[in-house]
Amino acid sequence: MRTFIAIDIGETVAANIGGLQNEIRGFLDPKQEGIKWVDPELTHLTLKFLGDVEEDQIAGITEIVARTAENFKKFSIEVKKVSSFGRPPRVVWIGINVSDILCRLQSRLDSRLTKAGFEADEKKFVGHLTLCRVKDFAVGKQLKRIIPGFEGFSAGKIHVKSICVYKSELTKTGPEYTLLASYNLA
């Protein structure tokens, strides 16, 4: 089963992201295809994507997440600045003010999961929340002109109280996430 470890963003940040998406949509042709918006209610901060794992591995994963969570105190992170990956943009996202504690949390999870036999993250952690994925070159060029107008946007703060393990199922209508476990920070 496709599995990932994430932080929930909370209702306020999700609502603000939904408003931001609507603002950006206002600059695009309403009939525009070639862009897939992420449902704000499904938006999360991914700490580690594990990919396909066997069901008998879930207990080990959740044990690592539980042990890691108990070593960290609750903290907050700011969600701000719209940006993108790719030229023209292929993924539009809003950034996370990556704090030392968030980096240590992600690094500790990655290290412990790597020791348990999962693949290490090769890329440096870039905390972000995906707003949309772009499939069409022309839409990407349009977004490239629009994004700078939203660089000062702030969606508020995520109050990090727990770490979650999710199962992800890809469907024709989009991904469906099932919470497998949640562990409170100390």
Regions found by a protein language model. Name each.
Residues 1-186:
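Histidine-dependent nucleotide/RNA phosphoesterase domain, centered on the 2H-phosphoesterase fold
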